[in-house]
C-alpha cells in the first residue's frame, strides 16, 4: 500500500510567515522590449518556430500572469513526491504533459534537451559564448543580464540575432535561472530551435517543476520560522494556471475571451482578470470529486480548436510512421516514463490519473522508482510506439473509475471516506467480475475483459491498462 506522506501544514498564524519565506525566482513577467523583440522575430521566423514546435510557447511567454502565493502554497501542500501527484480527499490528480502542451505550448516530441550540435552548430554556439564573455569583460559582470544581452543583439539584423533571442527566451521563460541572467547551458537548444529542429521541451519543463514541487512540499512540512527560506526558479505559473483550470472556486472572477490566434494561456493573463478572494486550503480540503474539472481542454471555446486526439466519437488508431504527430503526442502523454530535464530526471505516472485523459481509472500499481542516467531515461521516454493500437476517448466522455479503484482509495484514505463516497455509481464501472456484456463500458471502448487480458499479456510494464493498449493482431 502506498505510504501517505505527512501533509501537516503550518497553523494559520504562521501562514503569512510561510508565504514570506518562499521566493519564486522563476516567475517572470515580459517587459515591453521583450514583447517588441518577440513580435519582430515572429514576423521573420514564424515558419521555423512552428516547425520547431515553439511558436505557441513563445507567444505564451508574452503574456503576464500575477503570482498568487497563497494558491501556490495551498496546492503544494497536497503534493506527494513518491508519485509526483497531488493527493486530494477524493483521489489523485497531477500536472501532466498534456497540461504543459495546452497551457505553455511546449512540445512533447522531438530531440532531448541535451542533443548534440553538428560542426556548424557548434560554431554558432561558440559565437554566442564569445559575445557573452565580451559583455562580462567590458562591463565587469559576473553574469550577463537581459538588459545587456538585448543591447548587444536586439535589432542587429544579423544571423546571430535570432539565436540570441531564443537564448534569452530559454533563459528567462523556459529554464529560468535564479539570478536573472543569460544561461550558457541553453545555447545548444537555442541553436537547434533556430534551425527548426524540434526539441522536446515539455518533458524537461515538467521534470524541473516536479523536482521543485517536492522541494517546496518539504519546505512547507519542515517550516518553523521566516528565517527558513527557499528560492524556486521553475515555472510555477503552470501550477497556478493548472489549478485555475481545474478548480472553478479558485479561478479569477473573470477570464479573458480567447482571441483568434492567441494561445490558451491568454485567457488567464492580467489584462482583465481579477483575483478571487478564497481560502485556498479550505476549498481544497472540502472539495468533492464533482468540483474538479477532469478535462478542461475538451470544453469548447470561441476561437479554440480541438486537437485530433479530442474526437467527438471514441476511436482506435494504429501507431505507425504515417500517424499524425498529434496522436503520437497523446501517446506520449499517457505513457508511464521518465522525464529528462537539463539537470534532473523525474518519474512520470499518468496511469495514476487516467481519468484526466478520459480513460478508465483502475487501481494503480506499486510505484517503482529506479534511477537512470539522462541518456537511458530518454531512451525509455522515446521508446518506439510502432505496432501499438491507441485508444482515443471521446472528448465528451465523463470520468470513469473501476469500483476496485474507489475501494482502494477508501482504504488508503480512511479519514477521508466522505469525500471518496462522492464517487457515485454513475462514475464507476463494474467490478472485476463484470462480464463482457456489461452495458456500463463507455461507448466506443472495447470490452474491459479484452483490454485487461491484453495488459496482462504485455511484458512492457511502461504501458498501462487504463491508457495505452498494445493489441495483438488477433485482437484487432
Where are the language model's segments positioned?
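N-terminal leader regions that mediate targeting or early regulatory function
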Residues: 1-186, 195, 199-208, 348, ...
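Short linear interaction motifs
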Residues: 30, 68-69, 76-84, 147-152, ...
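Intrinsically disordered, low-complexity regions enriched in proline, serine, glycine
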Residues: 58-61, 88, 97-98, 110-113, ...
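Alpha-helical repeat scaffolds in large eukaryotic proteins
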Residues: 80, 105, 133, 137, ...
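Extended, charge-rich alpha-helical regions
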Residues: 139, 143, 231, 235-239, ...
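Extended amphipathic alpha-helical scaffolding regions
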Residues: 153, 190-192, 230, 363-366
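Hydrophobic, mid-to-C-terminal alpha-helical segments
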Residues: 180-245, 249-263
Amino acid at each position: 500500500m502506498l505510504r501517505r506522506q505527512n501533509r501537516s501544514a503550518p497553523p494559520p498564524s504562521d501562514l503569512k510567515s510561510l508565504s514570506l519565506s518562499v521566493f519564486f525566482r522563476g516567475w517572470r513577467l515580459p517587459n515591453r522590449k521583450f514583447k517588441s523583440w518577440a513580435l519582430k522575430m515572429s514576423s521573420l521566423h514564424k515558419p521555423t518556430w512552428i516547425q520547431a514546435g515553439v511558436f505557441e510557447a513563445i507567444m505564451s511567454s508574452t503574456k503576464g500572469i500575477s503570482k498568487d502565493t497563497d494558491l501556490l502554497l495551498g496546492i503544494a501542500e497536497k503534493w506527494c513526491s513518491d508519485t509526483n501527484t497531488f493527493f486530494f480527499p477524493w483521489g489523485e490528480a497531477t500536472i501532466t504533459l498534456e497540461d504543459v502542451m495546452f497551457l505553455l505550448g511546449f512540445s512533447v516530441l522531438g530531440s532531448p534537451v541535451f542533443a548534440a550540435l553538428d560542426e556548424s552548430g557548434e560554431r554558432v554556439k561558440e559565437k554566442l559564448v564569445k559575445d557573452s564573455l565580451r559583455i562580462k569583460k567590458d562591463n565587469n559582470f559576473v553574469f550577463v543580464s537581459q538588459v545587456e544581452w538585448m543591447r548587444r543583439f536586439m535589432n542587429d539584423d544579423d544571423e546571430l540575432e535570432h539565436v540570441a533571442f531564443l537564448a534569452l527566451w530559454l533563459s528567462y521563460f523556459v529554464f529560468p535561472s535564479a539570478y536573472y541572467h543569460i544561461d550558457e547551458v541553453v545555447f545548444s537548444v537555442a541553436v537547434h530551435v533556430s534551425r527548426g529542429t524540434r526539441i522536446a521541451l515539455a518533458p524537461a519543463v515538467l521534470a524541473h517543476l516536479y523536482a521543485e514541487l517536492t522541494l517546496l512540499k518539504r519546505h512547507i512540512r519542515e517550516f518553523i520560522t521566516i528565517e527558513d527560506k527557499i528560492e524556486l526558479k521553475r515555472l510555477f505559473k503552470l501550477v497556478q494556471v493548472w489549478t485555475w483550470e481545474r478548480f472553478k472556486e479558485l479561478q479569477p472572477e473573470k477570464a479573458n475571451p480567447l482571441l483568434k490566434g492567441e494561445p490558451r494561456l491568454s485567457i488567464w493573463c492580467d489584462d482583465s482578470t481579477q483575483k478571487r478572494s478564497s481560502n485556498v486550503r479550505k476549498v481544497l480540503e472540502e472539495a468533492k470529486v464533482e468540483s474538479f474539472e477532469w478535462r478542461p481542454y475538451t470544453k469548447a471555446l470561441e476561437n479554440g480548436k480541438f486537437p485530433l486526439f479530442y474526437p467527438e466519437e471514441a476511436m482506435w488508431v494504429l501507431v505507425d510512421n504515417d500517424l499524425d504527430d498529434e496522436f503520437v503526442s497523446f501517446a506520449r502523454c499517457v505513457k508511464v516514463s521518465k522525464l529528462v530535464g537539463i539537470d534532473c530526471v523525474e518519474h512520470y505516472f499518468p496511469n495514476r490519473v487516467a481519468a484526466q485523459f478520459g480513460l478508465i481509472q483502475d487501481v494503480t500499481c506499486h510505484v517503482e522508482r529506479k534511477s537512470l542516467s539522462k541518456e537511458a531515461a530518454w531512451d525509455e521516454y522515446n521508446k518506439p510506439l510502432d505496432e501499438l493500437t491507441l485508444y482515443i476517448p471521446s472528448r465528451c466522455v465523463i470520468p470513469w473509475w473501476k469500483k476496485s479503484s474507489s475501494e482502494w482509495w477508501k482504504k488508503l484514505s480512511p479519514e477521508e471516506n466522505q469525500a471518496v463516497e462522492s464517487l457515485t455509481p454513475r462514475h464507476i464501472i463494474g467490478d472485476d467480475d463484470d462480464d463482457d456484456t456489461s452495458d456500463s463500458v463507455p461507448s466506443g471502448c472495447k470490452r474491459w475483459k479484452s483490454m485487461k487480458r491484453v495488459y496482462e499479456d504485455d511484458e512492457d510494464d511502461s504501458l498501462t491498462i487504463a491508457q495505452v493498449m498494445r493489441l495483438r493482431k488477433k485482437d484487432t
